[in-house]
C-alpha cells in the first residue's frame, strides 16, 4: 500500500473515529486486535471468568480459530467492509491490546481514558524492524510520519527482558516509561505442564521416535528466496534424526512437510534441535533449553535488504552454517557442544507473567 493510499485511509479512519460516539455498554470493554493467536488467546482465556466485555478484531484467516473461546467474546473480521464496526468497537473500549503493527491505529483518535498495550508477536528480535528496517525509506518524510503515527498510538509494551525494550526504543521510538516488565503471555504455555512429559506424549502422538530437528526460517518477501531443507538427504545422512520443515503458510511446495495443522509452539515442544536464521524463535527455544543452529545461506543479502541487529551479530560463528552440508556436519560432529543461546532474554518471562498482566488490566480498566 503506497503512501498516498495510506494517507487517504488514515483520513477516513480519523473522520469516522470523530463522527462515531462511544456506545453505552453495561460492562467494561476490552478490544483485542489479533494477527497471532498465540499472543492474544492466552490473555482472553485468562479473562474468561471476568466481568469484561471482550471483542476481538482479527483477520478472516484467523477468525475460525476463535470458535473455542467463550460465548461472551465478540469477533469482528478486519476487512474494509467492517471498518465502521471496528471503529465502533474501539471507541467503547477502555483498553486495546494489540500484537502487531495495525495501520488503522495511525488514524484512530483515542478517547481520553483509553490505553493501548502492545504484546509483540515475538520473544525477541535478531533482525531490524520498524524504522530500523532497511526497506523503510527514512528520507521519505511522509512515509516515516505514517509509521510514527501508528507507533505513537501504543501506550505500553509488554516485554520479557531489557534487550527487547532496547529493540522497541531503537525501532519504534518507544521510551523506558512505556515498558511493562511482566513477561509475555505467549510463553505461558511452556509453564503449564511438565515439559519432558509433554514432549514424550507429543512425539508418541505424531509417531516420532528419532531426535526431532525443526527448521523454522524467517519468511522472505521474494518467495524464490524461501527454501526448505532436503528432508530425504538430511535423514539419509543423519539416520537417527527426523526433520520437519515448518515454512511460512503462503509458500506452496509439495516437497515441504504438511505440518500446517500443528502450531509452531507444539512443534518446538517436541524438538531436540531448532534450525533457524533471523527469526525470534531461537530466543523462544532457549526458554525450553533447545539449542539452535543458524542456517543463514543469505546472511549478507538479508542484512543489506532488511538489516540484522547487534544481537544477531553477537552470535558465535560456531553456531552458523551456510550450506546444507555444513549443517549436517555440525549436527554430526558438534551437537553435543551446542547450548541454547539467549537464555538471558527471559529475565521477566515466568509462570506469573500472565497473572501480572491480568492484575494490571484489573487495575487499569474501571469496573
Swiss-Prot record:
This is Teichoic acid glycerol-phosphate primase. It catalyses: N-acetyl-beta-D-mannosaminyl-(1->4)-N-acetyl-alpha-D-glucosaminyl di-trans,octa-cis-undecaprenyl diphosphate + CDP-glycerol = 4-O-[(2R)-glycerylphospho]-N-acetyl-beta-D-mannosaminyl-(1->4)-N-acetyl-alpha-D-glucosaminyl di-trans,octa-cis-undecaprenyl diphosphate + CMP + H(+). InterPro entries: Glycerophosphate_synth, TagF_C, TagF_N, TarB, Teichoic_Acid_Biosynth. GO terms for cellular component: plasma membrane. Belongs to the CDP-glycerol glycerophosphotransferase family. Catalyzes the addition of a single glycerol phosphate residue to the prenoldiphosphate-linked disaccharide. The gene is tarB. It holds the Pfam family Glyphos_transf. The keyword Cell wall biogenesis/degradation applies. GO terms for molecular function: CDP-glycerol glycerophosphotransferase activity. Pathway: Cell wall biogenesis; poly(ribitol phosphate) teichoic acid biosynthesis. It is found in: Cell membrane. PANTHER family: TEICHOIC ACID GLYCEROL-PHOSPHATE PRIMASE. It comes from Staphylococcus aureus (strain NCTC 8325 / PS 47). GO terms for biological process: cell wall organization; teichoic acid biosynthetic process. It comes from the Bacteria. Its EC number is 2.7.8.44. Gene3D superfamilies: 3.40.50.11820, 3.40.50.12580. Keywords: Cell membrane, Cell wall biogenesis/degradation, Membrane, Teichoic acid biosynthesis, Transferase. The keyword Amino-acid biosynthesis does not apply.
Amino acid at each position: 500500500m503506497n503512501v498516498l493510499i495510506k494517507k487517504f485511509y488514515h483520513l477516513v479512519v480519523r473522520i469516522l473515529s470523530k463522527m462515531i460516539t462511544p456506545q453505552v455498554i453495561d460492562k467494561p470493554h476490552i478490544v483485542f486486535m489479533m494477527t497471532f493467536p498465540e499472543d492474544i488467546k492466552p490473555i482472553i482465556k485468562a479473562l474468561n471468568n471476568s466481568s469484561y466485555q471482550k471483542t476481538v478484531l482479527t483477520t478472516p484467516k484467523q477468525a475460525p480459530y476463535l470458535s473455542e473461546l467463550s460465548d461472551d467474546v465478540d469477533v469482528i473480521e478486519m476487512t474494509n467492509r467492517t471498518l465502521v464496526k471496528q471503529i465502533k468497537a474501539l471507541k467503547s473500549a477502555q483498553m486495546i491490546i494489540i500484537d502487531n503493527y495495525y495501520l488503522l491505529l495511525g488514524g484512530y483518535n483515542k478517547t481520553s481514558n483509553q490505553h493501548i498495550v502492545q504484546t509483540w508477536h515475538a520473544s525477541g528480535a535478531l533482525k531490524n524492524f520498524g524504522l530500523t528496517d532497511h526497506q523503510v525509506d527514512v528520507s521519505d518524510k511522509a512515509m516515516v510520519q505514517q509509521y510514527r503515527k501508528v507507533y505513537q498510538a501504543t501506550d505500553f509494551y509488554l516485554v520479557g527482558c531489557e534487550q527487547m525494550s532496547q529493540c522497541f526504543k531503537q525501532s519504534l521510538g518507544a521510551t523506558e516509561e512505556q515498558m511493562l516488565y511482566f513477561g509475555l503471555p505467549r510463553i505461558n504455555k511452556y509453564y503449564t505442564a511438565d515439559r519432558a512429559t509433554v514432549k514424550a506424549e507429543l512425539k508418541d502422538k505424531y509417531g516420532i521416535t528419532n531426535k526431532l530437528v525443526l527448521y523454522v526460517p524467517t519468511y522472505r518477501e521474494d518467495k524464490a528466496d524461501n527454501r526448505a531443507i532436503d528432508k530425504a538427504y538430511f535423514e539419509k545422512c543423519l539416520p537417527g534424526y527426523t526433520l520437519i520443515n515448518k515454512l511460512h503458510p503462503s509458500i506452496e511446495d509439495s516437497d515441504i512437510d504438511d505440518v500446517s495443522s500443528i502450531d509452531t509452539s507444539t512443534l518446538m515442544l517436541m524438538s531436540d534441535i531448532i534450525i533457524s536464521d533471523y527469526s525470534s524463535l531461537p530466543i523462544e527455544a532457549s526458554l525450553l533449553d533447545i539449542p539452535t543452529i543458524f542456517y543463514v545461506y543469505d546472511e549478507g543479502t538479508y542484512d543489506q535488504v532488511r538489516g540484522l541487529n547487534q544481537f544477531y551479530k553477537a552470535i558465535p560463528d560456531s553456531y552458523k552454517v551456510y550450506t546444507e552440508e555444513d549443517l549436517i556436519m555440525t549436527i554430526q560432529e558438534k551437537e553435543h557442544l551446542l547450548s541454547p543461546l539467549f537464555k538471558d532474554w527471559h529475565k521477566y518471562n515466568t509462570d506469573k507473567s500472565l497473572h501480572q498482566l491480568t492484575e494490571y488490566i484489573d487495575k487499569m480498566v474501571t469496573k
